[in-house]
């Protein structure tokens, strides 16, 4: 079995593959203060709850945008599983030509998503990943990674609105029934949601025009992908496990 780990600023998503099939997945909070032992115990408990024999895991791959957490997980895997972790980095075989000056300048999660989406559609594509930041990545018709854009995440924008104002309350984010809010909370929810749908569609449309590609498939992933996709004119599909799929593909290309 293959254990894949995607470390983001807010969450860590773990997946366990049997061959090409995702057998189990978990989402846990990213906590920079946790030690390798704490992550090791947490991992052991997750496996035990699914009645997974840890001795059946023979490979581990990790992509992390939070270096201290990535390092703690590497130590946890070494101590509790007796395995060395393949860490996504600049020296890997991505199977994608890179047009940027150096792959080290691109977040590991973004390259992993690019690998997964091109394997999926085999032509020009845009990946929109809704996380603490929302990333937009363009892959060309020949699988060339062309770059992208980074915007503040929707929850990050919500937090900033609450923290930087004196009277606006903290609100729960869900699909608003109307654009014209009748209360302060409704108005905030409407502005954040519909404003963000406009941001997403606007960036995608500009990337389409700037790239000149006639046919671009747009895949969304990340925690808020389904929420925004329901009103987006540009998102073609939502793939919650896109990053995990990319990690599996990278492991297979680099083992």
From Swiss-Prot:
Per the entry, what this protein does is: Catalyzes the phosphorylation of pantothenate (Pan), the first step in CoA biosynthesis.
Q: Which GO terms describe its biological process?
A: coenzyme A biosynthetic process
UniProt: K(+) binding residues: 129
Q: Does the keyword Transmembrane apply?
A: no
Q: Which Pfam families match?
A: Pan_kinase (PF03309)
**Alphabetical list of SUPFAM superfamilies matching this protein:** Actin-like ATPase domain
UniProt keyword DNA damage, yes or no: no
Q: Name one GO molecular function term.
A: pantothenate kinase activity
The pathway this protein participates in, as annotated, is: Cofactor biosynthesis; coenzyme A biosynthesis; CoA from (R)-pantothenate: step 1/5
Name the keywords, alphabetized.
ATP-binding, Coenzyme A biosynthesis, Cytoplasm, Kinase, Metal-binding, Nucleotide-binding, Potassium, Transferase
Complex formation: Homodimer.
Q: What binding details are noted for the cofactor? A: A monovalent cation. Ammonium or potassium.
Q: What is this protein called?
A: Type III pantothenate kinase
Family of the protein in this entry: Belongs to the type III pantothenate kinase family.
EC identifiers of the protein: 2.7.1.33
In this protein, the active site sits at 109
NCBIfam families xrefs: baf, PRK13318.1-6, PRK13321.1
Q: Where the protein is mainly located, per its record?
A: cytoplasm
InterPro entries, from UniProt? Answer: ATPase_NBD, Type_III_PanK
Record's superkingdom? Bacteria
Species assigned in the record: Magnetococcus marinus (strain ATCC BAA-1437 / JCM 17883 / MC-1)
Q: Which gene encodes it?
A: coaX
